[in-house]
Amino acid sequence: MRLLGKIAIVTGAASGFGAGIARKFIAEGAQVMLADLNGAGVQTLAAELGDTAASYQLDVADRTQVTALAADVEAQFGALDIVVNNAGVTHLPTPMETVSEADFDRVFAVNCKSIYLASQIFIPAMKQRKSGVFLNVSSTAGISPRPNLNWYNASKGWVNTATETMAIELAQSGIRVNALNPVAGETPLLKSFMGEDTPEIRAKFLSTIPLGRFSTPEDMANAALYLCSDEASMITGVCLRVDGGRCI
């Protein structure tokens, strides 16, 4: 088991990539706190996954809630080893000047501020132990942006830069920081990216992916498992593309 004895938090764990990562981590021996704004969703998944899973209803952009989550993880499982910042949102495809300020604020709060808060709240204890892993789920949107998703693209570019900056600053503290850059996947966000889910629009999206398919929760879980395991002990600052060749 590649994560035996490890304690992890996965945000956005009620569905999609987050649920896939949580399932994989537990199968590989980790104890996992599943956190999501959808409290009922993570509660149901945690019950399915058994005693090594717990759930927490969480707004990742709320400092008070993230602080309380840290205390809850410590009380239930012990010292935290892995933080997977997976929670993410987008605005609907639209010209950049028509995106509402509320949607802009929501995108940057969930996609960016969440990582800032997680770093403030979880890193001090990791520094004391001289060990820990952060994994930030970004997107190919931060590398090769699509039109009409401007502020989402920008938020994911921020995630990639933040990941590299965190990695270089935290390396001497024994903390590794990496990111995953998935192409659009079969998750609840897919319809939001496309604007409308039709066979024609799906075909247009797929035509930009050389391997010819969307990413899956299993694809992301396999990549996350490697980067968060001790097998990747020499890997930090990497923004790994899980994109079927889209960004080539």
Give each language-model segment a name:
Residues 2, 116, 213-242, 247:
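C-terminal substrate-recognition "lid" of short-chain dehydrogenase/reductases
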Residues 124, 168-172, 233:
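Alpha-helical segment proximal to the catalytic Tyr-Lys
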Residues 119, 155:
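Active-site helix of classical SDR
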Residues 3-33:
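Canonical Rossmann dinucleotide-binding motif of NAD(H)/NADP(H)-dependent dehydrogenases/reductases
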Residues 39-40, 58-69, 101, 218:
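The beta1-alpha1 cofactor-binding region of Rossmann-like NAD(H)/NADP(H)-dependent oxidoreductases
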Residues 139:
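Residue(s) in the substrate-gating loop at a strand-loop-helix junction
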Residues 94-96, 100-105, 201, 205:
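Substrate-binding pocket helix/loop in short-chain dehydrogenase/reductase
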